[in-house]
UniProtKB/Swiss-Prot annotation:
The record's account of how the chain is modified after translation: One or more lysine residues are methylated.
SUPFAM superfamilies xref list: Ribosomal L11/L12e N-terminal domain, Ribosomal protein L11, C-terminal domain
CDD domains: Ribosomal_L11
Name of the protein in question: Large ribosomal subunit protein uL11
Quaternary assembly: Part of the ribosomal stalk of the 50S ribosomal subunit. Interacts with L10 and the large rRNA to form the base of the stalk. L10 forms an elongated spine to which L12 dimers bind in a sequential fashion forming a multimeric L10(L12)X complex.
Species of origin: Shewanella halifaxensis (strain HAW-EB4)
GO cellular component, one term: cytosolic large ribosomal subunit
HAMAP family: Ribosomal_uL11
Purpose: Forms part of the ribosomal stalk which helps the ribosome interact with GTP-bound translation factors.
Length: 142
């Protein structure tokens, strides 16, 4: 018989850096999940990513306090900033541009994010990532 789902927890945790301190500890503690077990499993699964890269994770908690988790791809904004070589986006993206990014780099990011994005095709996903870039103050050039 299938386990009864008690709830879902959505977090963004740095790759290889999950520890019991906030935000991980309190979020898992409320549901009664073994925090150290999650931290060890998460760090083992994310060791292929660059240290410190934010990784979205969805944790499914069952009524017997066991859990499973699914990692997603890093946020598009993080990948765009990394590709452009910037620390942060613009506070006023319509008037203040902070950098440029090539369309080919945007397409690579769209292909990376394709597993997590809902879109008809790669072109639609690329346009979505371009919109994210513009809203961060990046100029997309050919």
């Amino acid at each position: 018989m299938a386990k009864k789902v008690d709830g879902y927890i959505k977090l963004q945790v740095a790759a290889g850096a999950a520890n019991p301190s906030p935000p991980v500890g309190p979020a898992l503690g409320q549901k009664g999940v073994n925090i150290m077990e999650f931290c060890k499993a998460f760090n083992a699964r994310t060791d292929k990513f660059e240290k410190g890269m934010p990784i979205p994770v969805v944790i499914t908690v069952y009524s017997d306090r066991s859990f499973t988790f699914e990692t997603k791809t890093p946020p598009a904004s993080f990948l765009l900033l990394k590709a452009a070589g910037l620390k942060s986006g613009s506070g006023r993206p319509n008037t203040e541009k902070v950098g440029t990014i090539k369309r080919s780099a945007v397409q690579e990011i769209a292909e990376t994010k394709a597993a997590d994005m809902t879109g008809a095709d790669i072109e639609a996903m690329t346009r979505s990532i371009e919109g994210t870039a513009r809203s961060m103050g990046l100029v997309v050039e050919d």
